[in-house]
UniProtKB/Swiss-Prot annotation:
The chain crosses the membrane at residues 18-38, 60-80, 110-130, 150-170, 199-219, 232-252, 290-310, 528-548, 590-610, 618-638. The complex is composed of two ATP-binding proteins (BceA) and two transmembrane proteins (BceB). This is Bacitracin export permease protein BceB. The lineage of its organism: Bacteria, Bacillati, Bacillota, Bacilli, Bacillales. Pfam families: FtsX (PF02687). The keyword Flavoprotein does not apply.
Length: 648
């Protein structure tokens, strides 16, 4: 047999056994090429407009490379260890280490760059679909075209050639460092099998569960008023991160073994074949794979969490725009409003107008704060708030000595939570007007120009408002003191009104807002974030799922002898598959459930920073991630089925 024939035979064998690796490699290349193609697409100029958009795309492409590189190196490590006996045989028949390395390199070259070419072709084919998805998410009215980008091809080839160089280096070091004898023991020694549960396992296992639960508990208190200074907040975040990650490692290192051993003891040693194939195998293997499982679980939680938060922001974009701009159009200058209304009247567009006088006042709120805010560089006892008269609000009516708040942002409430009632003071230039605070309402009545994006609006009686008008502090007043809201009666005429809004020659330097454009701006920002996070999350899901699948391939080959014995003892293929299915539920389910749990507590602790709806976006992301992740568990069961079938 010639060397070339040997290479082709090995290549054929590897392609047959490692088809999922080839698929994952092609998929990774396709994603990267499609992603880089977007950066060179002229139609993407609006999305990448500004430093932040372009930087986000470039950062995402770097993270994509890091994920793919880590996966390929880890997968290559699994495969070369699996071929250790084959490498040992090559050396036993007289091949030098250099020759063995050249054979491996030639095989990898054909397999790798063949997959690279296939991946580029797939990436080119899906690039239009990817662009369409991005345009849809960001709300851009653009036509996606199918075009081949030479710069994207060059960048992809350079990046994956460098990754190939790292793979060659890893293979070279492996072949050089191993002796012939050690090559025949690599597989058997790669996983440390535990023969019995020790006291150390019980302690580690208990610590793991407690550490995770403590991290969850602290995260639930993160923005609840327990940590009132920036220093303690930062320390708490670091503690949560460390506690959960270390707890996850200890969980795999000891908790799984400990818990499953309790189940086994409860059965008093009467284990069915299903239990032998599932519980025992998982007990002995998860401990040795604790590090990689911890990494997969942690990054899965991170990916699910980030995708949930970005989807929460995207999902809440319209509601957020309504909070910032409570009418279809808001203006802050009467003359500009007159120009705009004149244009609407000229085109027969009916509208409703709301005019609200707004003053800015210092409000002493110390007595109604739930907790004092420490560690900040401003006086938290005093808020600079917009103030309006109650006659401007149909649903609120206050007495001369009373005041109410409305439109307080959820995020601000987490940091500066208010009591239901108490005493406040409205401070003018010289006078102090004491008021009884009677509660917080949910309506948003003036634009973000007055509310600074999250501060509440104070509603007072006409008498109190007049007193403030006579004693205003000019140093804190804005350039405008009037809010004009215009709502189009017929929604079908809204787009025409937006065009007129842009054509109106506004003369004031104070801002004017269109709600629909604020919503589009929010969707464009968060749509890009969701697209990038989704892209990275999908890449990690595919690569981590493949790693778990490859581990199951190795385990199935190692346990093939056991299946042969069990088949000879009379157990059917169906009997064995019952245990295998349970095993895969645990092998894939435990990292998935832990990742989902980590992401749930992370998202729940700070979701209000990103939007005003938690459950629907988060559940949708989790269900989608679970469905895609389950595919690899199903593939593992099918592979085991093939191994069991071949066992006799």
């Amino acid at each position: 047999m010639t060397i070339n024939h040997l290479i082709l035979q090995n290549l054929k064998k590897n392609l047959k056994n490692y088809y999922l690796y080839v698929f994952a490699l092609m998929f990774s290349v396709a994603l990267y090429f499609a992603f880089v193609t977007l950066q060179y697409d002229p139609a993407m100029d609006d999305v990448q407009e500004g430093i932040k958009g372009a930087a986000a795309m470039k950062t995402a492409s770097v993270l994509l490379v890091v994920i793919v590189t880590t996966f390929l190196l880890y997968a290559n490590n699994i495969f070369i260890k699996r071929r250790s006996k084959e490498i040992g045989l090559f050396q036993m028949i007289g091949m030098t280490k250099g020759k063995v390395f050249r054979i491996l390199s030639a095989e990898n070259l054909i397999l790798y760059f063949g997959s690279l070419a296939g991946g580029v072709f797939i990436g080119f084919a899906i690039s239009k679909v990817v662009t369409m998805i991005l345009f849809k998410l960001t709300g851009l009215d653009r036509i996606a075209t199918l075009s081949f980008s030479v710069p994207a091809l060059v960048q992809t080839v350079i990046v994956f050639t460098l990754i190939y160089g790292l793979i060659l280096l890893a293979n070279y070091l492996f072949v050089k460092q191993q002796t012939i004898l050690s090559l025949f023991h690599v597989t058997s020694s790669s996983e440390d099998r535990v023969k019995k549960v020790s006291l150390f396992d019980i302690i580690i296992g208990s610590l793991g569960i407690v550490s995770i639960l403590v991290g969850y508990f602290v995260s639930s208190k993160l923005f609840g008023g327990t940590f009132t200074s920036m220093e303690t907040l930062f320390i708490a975040m670091i503690f949560i991160l460390g506690s959960v990650i270390i707890g996850t490692y200890f969980f795999y290192k000891g908790s799984v073994t400990f818990l499953f051993n309790l189940i086994r003891k409860k059965k008093n040693g009467h284990l069915a074949v299903r239990d032998v194939l599932s519980l025992s195998s998982i007990m002995f293997r998860m401990k040795s794979n604790a590090l990689i499982l911890t990494i997969i679980t942690t990054i899965s939680g991170l990916a699910i969490g980030l995708l949930s938060l970005s989807y929460i922001s995207y999902y809440s974009a319209e509601k957020t725009a309504e909070h910032y701009v409570p009418s279809d159009f808001t203006l802050t200058d009467m003359e500009d409003a007159a120009y705009f209304k004149e244009a609407l009247d000229a085109h027969g567009i009916a509208y409703d107008e709301t005019v609200i006088d707004v003053l800015i006042a210092e409000v002493y709120v110390k007595d109604i704060l739930e907790e004092p805010l420490d560690g900040v560089n401003f006086d938290s006892d005093i808020m600079i708030l917009p103030v309006i008269r109650d006659t401007a609000v149909e649903s609120v009516n206050v007495a001369p000595e009373e005041a109410a708040f409305t439109g307080y942002n959820d995020m601000m409430q987490q940091f500066m939570s208010l009591k239901d009632s108490g005493s406040i003071e409205l401070r003018g230039k010289q006078k102090v007007i004491p008021q009884n605070y009677i509660g917080l309402h949910s309506e948003y009545l003036v634009s973000t120009y007055f509310s600074s994006g999250g501060l509440p609006l104070a509603i007072v009686n006409e008498t109190t408002f007049s007193q403030l008008q006579d004693d205003i502090n000019p140093e804190i007043q804005l350039d405008s003191s009037v809010h004009i809201g215009i709502d189009i009666k017929d929604a079908r005429q809204l787009q025409e009104a937006v065009v007129l809004f842009h054509e109106t020659p506004f003369t004031s330097e104070t801002p004017q807002y269109a709600q629909v454009e604020m919503s589009q701006s929010q969707k464009q920002t968060f749509g890009l974030a969701m697209f990038i996070v989704g892209f990275l999350g999908l890449t990690f899901l595919i690569t981590s799922g493949c790693i778990l699948y490859f581990k199951q391939m190795d385990e199935s080959e190692e346990e093939k002898g056991s299946y042969t014995i069990l088949r000879k003892l009379g157990f059917t293929q169906g009997d064995l598959l019952k245990g295998i299915r349970v095993k895969q539920v645990f092998n894939f389910g435990i990292p998935l459930l832990l990742g989902l749990s980590h992401s749930y507590f992370a998202v729940k602790s700070g979701w209000f920073f990103f939007g005003n709806e938690l459950w629907t976006p988060m559940i949708m992301v989790m269900l989608l991630y679970t469905a895609l992740y389950s595919i690899f568990a199903i593939l593992s069961v099918l592979y085991y089925k093939k191994v069991i079938k071949d066992a006799l």
